[in-house]
Amino acid sequence: MFGKLTLSAVPYHEPIVMVTLAVVALLGLGVVGAITYYRKWTYLWTEWLTSVDHKKIGVMYIVVALVMLVRGFADAIMMRGQLALAEGANHGYLPPEHYDQIFTAHGVIMIIFMAMPFMTGLMNLAVPLQIGARDVAFPFLNSLSFWLLVVSAMLVNVSLGLGEFARTGWVAYPPLSELAYSPGVGVDYYIWALQISGMGTLLTGINFLVTVFKMRTPGMKLMQMPIFTWTCTFANILIVASFPILTAALGLLSLDRYLDMHFFTNELGGNAMMYINLFWAWGHPEVYILILPAFGIFSEVTATFAGKRMFGYKSMVWASAAITFLGFTVWLHHFFTMGSGGDVNGFFGVATMLISIPTGVKLFNWLFTIYKGRLRFSTPILWTLGFMVTFTIGGMTGVLLAIPGADFLLHNSLFLIAHFHNTIIGGAVFGYLAGFAFWFPKAFGFTLDEKWGKRSFWCWLVGFYMAFMPLYILGFMGMTRRLNHYDNPLWKPYLVVAFFGAVLIFCGIACQLIQLFVSVRNRKQLADVNGDPWEGRTLEWATSSPPPFYNFAELPKVQDVDAFHDMKKAGTAYRKLPAYQPIHMPKNTAAGFSIAVFAFVFGFAAIWHIWWLMAVGFVGMIGSFIVRSYNQDVDYYVQPEEIEKIESARFQQLAKQV
């Protein structure tokens, strides 16, 4: 009746896992108890969990990202600790099978369940406001996308206490991910978590492309959109083009595992190299899906804190377009050693090097924007300056790896690991943390505490260099990745330094949590009264902080890129309208939540081969969608009286500051 699920699926013999489960259970009970004690369940359900407001969905995305950052970093510091100890006769504290699961979970969580939701959350928060829209094109799909992410993240975490996670590495190459070598449920957890979250991401990409192309405010031409909106648009083009490839690759792997087919097994006509091609045809665009919005954040932050118009706006747009196109032409550099031949390797090596040109254009444009600007050294600009140095190093090592001959020497070594983290942490993560500090007051109405923000930045920056620069050296010394034990005593000092670097990054994360606590405690002193704490230049700063649920009482008229800056110069930024018109808005819905719950049931049942429960989940998903499709009560009009009340309260608040 319960398929492969038995009591033996609970890892009683793993003390680390059981202690972790106990801690998580206690924290969960504490949260549930607090919500119950303060009687907030109704508020959470009506205002947040069923909301289709893009701003609230953005906040929830970021909450999930921060939770998964803690989970993914816990895996990282455990690996660093293991490698600092496991030399010679000392085998460390993690058994190999547990280490391999942590190794896989870290990559999957940090890329799919931390970086992606962080990026999507910031995109939800800022893009509709930046283009003067009242919401996204498909508010219900936005809610559904979020809840699909949540349930897929839950599947990854459920694997901690029921069964196991994949031991394949985050790429899950065959034949290791095939049934013969991974007969347990770990790879199935991997497949269904990525399939469900990938569907949500694809819906997000479609949603935001339609939003940007069809819902810009009157007068805003494409070449008048903020750079962040542009980079998110290019990222969404990559999402729509690449995520179906991942869906297909994992679908074929599922057929191999569930129906004994042979797409990726060498016997009976299969080819493991086809999976590797398909995976990286998605995987390399995924890197640019993560980095392009971060580039947009750095552009917004640089222009704002330098007090200048962005240098080379058009070249920034075209550079983003070039990166988007070239990002689809370089996937083979992930497996130069697979035997494609010198001509093929040479083509992809040159294409990889070419990406450094538009990236360099962006870097010089940021520097020229800062040049002769009156730079204010708040936390967002510190993350930006840290990125410029760190990402440049990562880019140079990437150009080195683009040379096939050098890659043959360094492939699969820790040099590659250092390069990847150099670009993703130094680029994407630093960008998201800059955006988090930058747009936090817009979401919550008060700024983050600067003192703790700067402490976090310095811990992250110094910790990053301590954690990953030694890995470049270890790569040259011949240390390969995926090791849980080694015999070379010369490697140990570098791995110990890397461990202490990870500890410093932990201090940075702790400082961010303290920063949140201190900021909430001191929110009255840190209040953003006029909605423009940074002297912003784009339309999101024209609203109150947080913005009203309809965003704009009247859609703004735009003539140029820095629309809000122009309004302030013209004296029209804070103009109260004599009368208001009704505003068309979507109603909240629980349909996204219910469809995602059934998707979780479907995925869990598929993992454990509980076929009747899988049918329940499938019928529930389809049924919920049909019910939603026939529901005509999905929108309403905000009446002028309500708008007048909200806007009058805002202008009274502004008048007190004059």
UniProtKB/Swiss-Prot annotation:
For binding Fe(II)-heme o, which residues are annotated in this chain's numbering?
Answer: 288, 411, 419
Q: Where does Cu(2+) bind?
A: 284, 333-334
The cofactor note from the UniProt entry for this protein is: Binds 1 copper B ion per subunit. Binds 1 low-spin heme b per subunit.
Which residues lie toward the Cytoplasmic compartment? 36-56, 123-135, 211-232, 299-315, 368-380, 445-456, 515-594
- Indicate how the chain sits in the lipid bilayer: Multi-pass membrane protein
* Gene Ontology terms: biological process: aerobic respiration; electron transport coupled proton transport; respiratory electron transport chain
Q: Note the position of the cross-link 1'-histidyl-3'-tyrosine (His-Tyr).
A: 284-288
The Swiss-Prot or TrEMBL record lists the needed cofactor(s) as: Cu(2+); heme b; Fe(II)-heme o
Give EC number(s), comma-separated: 7.1.1.3
**Top EC category:** translocase
Tell me a Gene Ontology molecular-function term this record carries: oxidoreductase activity, acting on diphenols and related substances as donors, oxygen as acceptor
Localization per Swiss-Prot or TrEMBL: Cell inner membrane
User: Binding residues for a ubiquinone, per the UniProt record?
Assistant: 71, 75, 98
Identify the InterPro entries for this entry: Cyt_c_oxase-like_su1_dom, Cyt_c_oxase-like_su1_sf, Cyt_C_Oxase_1, Cyt_c_Oxase_su1_BS, Cyt_c_ubiqinol_oxidase_su1
Q: What does this protein do?
A: Cytochrome bo(3) ubiquinol oxidase is the terminal enzyme in the aerobic respiratory chain. Catalyzes the four-electron reduction of O2 to water, using a ubiquinol as a membrane soluble electron donor for molecular oxygen reduction. Has proton pump activity across the membrane in addition to electron transfer, pumping 2 protons/electron and generating a proton motive force. All the redox centers of this enzyme complex are located within the largest subunit, subunit I. Protons are probably pumped via D- and K- channels found in this subunit.
Record text on subunit structure and interactions:
The cytochrome bo(3) ubiquinol oxidase complex is a heterooctamer of two A chains, two B chains, two C chains and two D chains.
Please state what the protein is called.
Cytochrome bo(3) ubiquinol oxidase subunit 1
Q: Which organism is it from?
A: Pseudomonas aeruginosa (strain ATCC 15692 / DSM 22644 / CIP 104116 / JCM 14847 / LMG 12228 / 1C / PRS 101 / PAO1)
